[in-house]
Amino acid sequence: TTPPVKSSPDSQNSALVDDPPHVEPATIEDLPALTELVMDLMSRSDDFSPDRELQERGLRLILEQPNRGRIFVVRNKDKIFGMVNLLFTISTARGGFVILMEDVVIHPDHRGQGYGAMLTDYVVDFARRKNFKRITLLTDRMSAESQEFFKKQGFEYSNMIPMRRIID
């Protein structure tokens, strides 16, 4: 489904009162809500344990260093429905900058409404416009639902184990 409003990845404007849910960059003021979303994600993984201090510190590092990564949120008015964080690195295989996409999480009350697809579409558009060469993500091995979602978004399995989407 096509998102009703798609704001610019570089926009720092917050949603207007009558705006439908849309994607925009997170701000430092969003840190408490982002921390809650990441802690929820960590609590559902066998590989991680939620730790408010660690999650908040990691999110703050990304927010304070936009040259190293970005966090985007699905926002409606003053409520955050979901988030994704992107970390930037260089790939010698692709000969350019690539993205490691992490913490794709939608609040439990808002799952199944297209917000995950809205976020990933936004990330792909951002990556293309900024000339990134690939988006790589790690998804839980045991979560067939998560893997199917990302396959529908154009990601594929690689021989290196993570899933990825090549950006042309």
Named regions from a protein language model:
Residues 22-34:
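A short beta-loop-alpha structural element at the N-terminal edge
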Residues 36-61:
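Conserved GNAT-fold acetyl-CoA-binding loop/helix
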Residues 61-73, 100:
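A short helix-loop-beta-strand connector motif used in the catalytic cores of GNAT acetyltransferases and
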Residues 73, 79-88, 105:
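Conserved beta-strand in the GNAT
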Residues 79, 90-101, 111, 158-159:
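A conserved beta-turn-beta hairpin within the catalytic core of GNAT-like acetyltransferases
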Residues 106, 112-125, 152:
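Conserved acetyl-CoA-binding loop-helix of GNAT-fold acetyltransferases
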Residues 117, 129, 141-159:
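Conserved active-site alpha-helix within GNAT-family acetyltransferase domains
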Residues 120, 127-139:
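Conserved GNAT acetyl-CoA-binding A-motif
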